[in-house]
Regions:
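AMP-forming adenylation/ATP pyrophosphatase catalytic core
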Residues: 1-182
Length: 182
């Protein structure tokens, strides 16, 4: 039922039985998976994820402006929208860029005392390994402002009202993922 509700064809019973056997037999960090060609079932921590076919790497830098929405195959829907709570102060005409992990980036999440590597921040946020290269990073020139929907980084724009800024903004990432099942 779970696969069909997502519009996917169930695998042969023998393939599904083998996947279930691997799930029961695996321990710790093992991540059994079932590849069907059009989707993949994979365990991460205590959940089974139904993932669309891997669309390949994401590496192009994209421009986004406050109020903008971008749909990226294999990544999802990314928007920069106003928030009523604390956020990133931007002028409506500022041009920002969405980039992807390259390695070595650091962020001090807003409200935290220390900066950490993005790898560590994403692990602590529970982002599955296969999604970590797809988390959109919001930059203003060379300054990292936010990590997908993980949260904003402490920056020159966090919580500081600029004279051209009308309201705070937040980066919202809705990943392309069929679902996770506990």
């Amino acid at each position: 039922g779970w696969l069909k509700s997502g519009g996917y064809q169930a695998p042969d019973q023998s393939v599904l039985d083998e996947f279930l056997r691997q799930l029961r037999a695996s321990t710790g960090d093992a991540r059994p998976q079932l590849n069907s060609g059009s989707y993949r079932l994979q365990r991460y921590k205590e959940a089974i994820y139904l993932l669309p076919e891997d669309p390949g790497p994401v590496d192009q830098e994209l421009a986004i402006a406050p109020g903008g929405v971008i749909e990226i195959p294999g990544v999802g829907r990314i928007s920069l929208r106003r928030t009523e709570s604390e956020g990133i102060w931007l002028a409506a005409d500022e041009s920002l860029s969405l980039q992807w992990r390259d390695g070595g980036e650091r962020c001090r999440l807003a409200g935290h005392k220390r900066s950490k590597s993005l790898k560590k921040v994403l692990q602590e946020a529970g982002i599955p390994p296969w999604w970590r290269q797809r988390v959109p990073l919001l930059y203003l020139e060379e300054e990292l402002l936010s990590l997908g929907s993980v949260g904003p980084c402490q920056s020159s724009r966090w919580g500081v009202s600029g004279q051209d800024a009308e309201a705070p903004w937040e980066l919202v990432w809705e990943p392309t993922i069929a679902s996770g099942y506990d």
